[in-house]
Amino acid sequence: MEDRWLILRFKRGSTDALCRIYEKYERVMLAVAFGLLNDRSAAEDVVHDVFVAFAQSAEKLSPAGSLRSYLTTCTANLARDRCRAIKRQSHIVDPAQAPNAEAPSPLSEVLQGEQLRQLSDALAQLPYEQREAVVLHLKADMTFRAIARAQGLSINTVQSRYRYGIEKLRSMLNGELEP
């Protein structure tokens, strides 16, 4: 309900509403973009560009539907476009660069540092379609149905990509496959 109210306020010219939308969704969008691009700077650029496009499309916005799903889908689509354009080599990521949807405690950062590094490396090795399904489902909390609708795919295709991605991640993290 708050999202509909924010959209209506934003359509009427409230910059405070846009700021609130940004504050509310920036972390999850950054987590999605980083999970797909494996590059913090590129992820920040994607989130910035999505918000600029969002702000410029105020008159076209509809208060119906999930704003979170809309923004994370826009983020995933732009990240996909950037991946296609860049065709860059994946690299080892410093877990300190990785944005999380929720800020971890210092103790959990210390305990999970190596695991995060291994997970980032393994995630970067997945085919893009599988990585996208995994990131959208786990980091953006999107349902398979919402992902399928946003990408114009069948729900079975999305579930298969997710399942294959999770299986490959599990194999890589258990040392069964080389990254």
Where are the model-predicted features located?
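Sigma70-family region 2
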Residues: 11-12, 38, 48-66, 85-87
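Internal acidic/polar
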Residues: 89-112, 116
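C-terminal edge and immediately downstream basic/flexible tail or linker adjoining helix-turn-helix-like DNA-binding
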Residues: 5, 9, 91, 112-113, ...
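Helix-turn-helix DNA-binding module
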Residues: 1, 121-132, 136, 140-160, ...
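Structural recognition of an alpha-helix C-terminal capping motif at a helix-to-coil junction
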Residues: 31, 45-52, 65-77
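Conserved RNAP core-binding helix
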Residues: 6, 22, 30, 40-57, ...
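Arg/Lys-rich amphipathic alpha helix in sigma70-family domain 2
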Residues: 56-63, 73-93, 112
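N-terminal module of bacterial RNA polymerase sigma factors
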Residues: 1-28, 35, 145-146, 167, ...
